């Protein structure tokens, strides 16, 4: 009998030991598995980054989740209590799991024959939201419990509550209590009332169902329930609860205005962060950065709105596209960039898409280098003839050739033959070297590049950047979209400090500016209206499939403040899709964008120690000449020559004498219509003529015939 009693006593001891052992193993497993499952990086809540323009105004937020993490100390006590009251009233008593709630949930799950009720504590919800999926399975619930227990071991209750409130989803793309406070009440979380806190606490259970915007009645009903629970649990008095329940929801929803005009610019900001500063798009979306950009919001919006107007596009249908970019002359920062008429985020950005630049290339590849190399000047005469260079025969667009024209006129009227002739004179490699210095590196080797005939082309951004060199007195600065990037701690992790490099002299740049002004005043860029100084160049390329069709149309130019380039055409040109007119349309568009943005009335200022480019001397034929003998002192004869002088007193007149069939240059005078030859011989038989001379072109004009002096004029 004693043995039987001993045996009965031994069995419970064995069970107790085994239970203790299994409990120990379970506890160790929870600790080990909990730490194994927890990825502490996930506890670092992502914050949205913001983009601010040149005035410091926020223009966009970048985020995967619209979230603004805050410290627990910034969240009012009664707001915290509203969430505790409804989500986990024993939060400060349990160690990760609430046995009573779990028991109730298990009982209801058994009755339902499956997993239907959560019974989760705030810590468990935090574990689920950060580390686990949202499926309702017993395995997921087990992991949730394990992680929750370990979170309770590693973090204080206040820290857990802080993380919980910062990761909750409040609907409408808003994550975290601070972002929710901004969105629904347009105020800081620290300024929330108990009623407003209850409004927010009502949302997370079913963000769509209890949205105070979509379903205000349902939200108010749940808010009032939460206020009642706060009273029941001793957080507020009955009077406070009744007073709060009597209030309206008090929403002051922050307007989330759609700003599609910023989309193409923002995409270029993200691209530059990746390419230039090795900050990935994902990092920008999650890092809480402040990205300062040189954006001019007014100019950006104006360009977007103007470019949407169909009247600017001479296409075969309404689907012709366009792109524009504008750069600050002082900094080189991009103030506006439009990637398309209906650009969508992450779409085909035509700001960086390459196209054939046409005649906009002439100042960059030909005339700028020609002046800088001191081989030609603005009024140097260039050959304007139909001639072939091997198998390449460039033609003027109007098929008219003048034999010789000045560089200034060749640019003003966009003549092709002189441009190709000049490039041939200075050398293709010379032209390419200047293009490369201006940010355009191309493989093309032929003379066709004088006219923008390239294998691939250039982008509006590249073209604007290159023209900016002239506007910046000959210094090239690579266009940029990011001024600086500041992290959450206020540290500057990226800062634009690029120094420009000298490409053209100030004199060359000023001469080019003056010539390009003539293009706008009387040349190919007269279309449209602009009040203020503007220098620029048109360009277009032909579509050979249809007679008279245009493939690409351009205007690139600059004011004293802004440089820009506008392109228009089709993404794919074919027999049914082409422009029916050329560069006059982007020229007018360019002018209207700046005018409507208020960028008018500015005047170019000549740099110090730079000579002004004189206006061209336009010689008229000298047709009338009189030559008479006159008496002077001591009875000597003087020959007096008189002719019709030019209005331009800079004109020089050469006096030629012909004696015995031999012509000799006797003298020259400037700005006069008369000349005297003293001590004349009445019997010399000499005759005289006058020929005008242009000191700019180094060429003579049309002069008079030879005339013999008369002793007595009638």
Swiss-Prot record:
Catalytic function, reaction form: [GlcNAc-(1->4)-Mur2Ac(oyl-L-Ala-gamma-D-Glu-L-Lys-D-Ala-D-Ala)](n)-di-trans,octa-cis-undecaprenyl diphosphate + beta-D-GlcNAc-(1->4)-Mur2Ac(oyl-L-Ala-gamma-D-Glu-L-Lys-D-Ala-D-Ala)-di-trans,octa-cis-undecaprenyl diphosphate = [GlcNAc-(1->4)-Mur2Ac(oyl-L-Ala-gamma-D-Glu-L-Lys-D-Ala-D-Ala)](n+1)-di-trans,octa-cis-undecaprenyl diphosphate + di-trans,octa-cis-undecaprenyl diphosphate + H(+); Preferential cleavage: (Ac)2-L-Lys-D-Ala-|-D-Ala. Also transpeptidation of peptidyl-alanyl moieties that are N-acyl substituents of D-alanine
Domain of life: Bacteria
Cellular compartment(s): Cell membrane
Region (Transpeptidase): 297-592
Extracellular side: 34-714
Residue span of region Transglycosylase: 49-217
Transmembrane segments: 13-33
GO term, biological process aspect, one: proteolysis
Functional pathway: Cell wall biogenesis; peptidoglycan biosynthesis
Topological category with respect to the lipid bilayer: Single-pass membrane protein
Cytoplasmic side: 1-12
NCBIfam families xrefs: PBP_1a_fam (TIGR02074)
Stated family: In the N-terminal section; belongs to the glycosyltransferase 51 family.
Name of the protein in its database record: Penicillin-binding protein 1F
Source organism of the structure: Bacillus subtilis (strain 168)
Native organism taxonomy: Bacteria, Bacillati, Bacillota, Bacilli, Bacillales
Gene name of this polypeptide: pbpF
């Amino acid at each position: 009998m004693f043995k039987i009693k001993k045996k009965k006593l031994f069995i419970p001891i064995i069970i107790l030991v085994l239970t203790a052992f299994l409990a120990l193993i379970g506890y160790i497993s929870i600790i080990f598995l909990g730490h194994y499952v927890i990825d502490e990086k996930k506890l670092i809540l992502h914050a949205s980054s913001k983009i601010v323009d040149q005035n410091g105004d926020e223009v966009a937020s970048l985020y995967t989740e619209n979230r603004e993490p805050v410290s627990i100390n910034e969240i009012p006590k009664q707001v915290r209590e509203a969430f505790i009251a409804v989500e986990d009233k024993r939060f400060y008593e349990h160690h990760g799991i609430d046995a009573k709630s779990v028991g109730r949930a298990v009982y209801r799950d058994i009755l339902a024959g499956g997993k239907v009720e959560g019974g989760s504590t705030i810590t468990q919800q935090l574990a689920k939201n950060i580390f686990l999926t949202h499926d309702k399975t017993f395995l997921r619930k087990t992991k949730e419990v394990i992680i929750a227990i370990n979170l309770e071991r590693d973090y204080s209750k206040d820290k857990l509550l802080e993380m919980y409130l910062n990761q909750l989803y409040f609907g409408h793309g808003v994550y975290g209590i601070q972002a929710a406070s901004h969105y629904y009440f347009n105020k800081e979380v620290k300024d929330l009332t108990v009623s407003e806190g209850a409004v927010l606490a009502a949302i997370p259970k079913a963000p769509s169902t209890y949205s105070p915007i979509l379903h205000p009645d349902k939200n108010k009903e749940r808010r009032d329930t939460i206020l009642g629970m706060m009273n029941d649990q001793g957080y507020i008095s009955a009077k406070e609860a009744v007073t709060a329940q009597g209030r309206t929801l008090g929403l002051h929803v922050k307007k989330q205005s759609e700003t599609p005009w910023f989309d193409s610019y923002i995409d270029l900001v993200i691209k530059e962060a990746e390419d230039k500063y090795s900050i990935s798009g994902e990092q920008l979306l999650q890092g809480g950065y402040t990205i300062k950009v040189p954006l001019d919001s007014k100019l950006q919006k104006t360009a977007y709105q103007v470019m949407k107007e169909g009247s600017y596009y001479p296409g075969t249908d309404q689907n012709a596209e366009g792109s524009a970019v504008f750069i600050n002359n002082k900094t080189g920062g991009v103030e506006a960039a439009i990637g398309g008429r209906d650009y969508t985020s992450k779409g085909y950005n035509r700001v960086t898409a390459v196209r054939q630049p046409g005649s906009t290339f002439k100042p960059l590849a030909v005339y700028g280098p020609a002046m800088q190399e001191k081989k030609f000047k603005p009024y140097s005469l260039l050959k304007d003839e139909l001639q072939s260079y091997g198998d390449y025969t460039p033609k003027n667009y109007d098929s008219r050739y003048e034999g010789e024209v000045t560089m200034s006129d060749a640019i003003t009227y966009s003549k092709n033959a002189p441009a190709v002739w000049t490039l041939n004179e200075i050398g293709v490699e010379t032209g390419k070297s200047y293009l490369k210095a201006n940010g355009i590196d191309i493989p093309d080797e032929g003379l066709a590049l004088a006219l923008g005939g390239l294998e691939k082309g250039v982008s509006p951004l590249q073209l604007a950047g290159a023209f900016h060199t002239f506007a910046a007195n000959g210094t090239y600065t690579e266009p940029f979209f990011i001024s600086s990037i500041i992290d959450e701690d206020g540290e500057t992790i990226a800062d634009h400090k690029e120094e420009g490099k000298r490409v053209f002299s100030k004199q060359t740049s000023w001469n080019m500016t003056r010539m390009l002004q003539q293009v706008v005043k009387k040349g190919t860029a007269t279309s449209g209206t602009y009040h203020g100084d503007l220098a620029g160049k048109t360009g277009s390329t032909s579509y050979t499939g249809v007679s008279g069709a245009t493939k690409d149309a351009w205007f690139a130019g600059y004011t004293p403040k802004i440089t820009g380039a506008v392109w228009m055409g089709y993404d794919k040109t074919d027999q049914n899709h082409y422009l029916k007119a050329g560069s006059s349309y982007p020229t007018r568009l360019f002018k209207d964008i700046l005018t409507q943005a208020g960028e008018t009335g500015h005047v170019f200022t000549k740099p110090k120690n730079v000579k002004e480019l004189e206006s061209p001397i336009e010689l008229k034929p000298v047709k009338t000449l009189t030559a008479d003998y006159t008496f002077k002192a001591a009875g000597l004869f003087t020959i007096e020559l008189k002719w019709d002088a030019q209005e331009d007193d800079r004109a020089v007149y050469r006096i030629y004498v012909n004696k015995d069939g031999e012509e000799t240059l006797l003298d020259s005078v400037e700005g006069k219509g008369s000349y005297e030859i003293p001590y004349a011989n009445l019997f010399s038989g000499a005759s005289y003529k006058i020929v005008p001379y242009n000191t700019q072109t180094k060429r003579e004009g049309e002069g008079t015939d030879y005339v013999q002096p008369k002793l007595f004029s009638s």
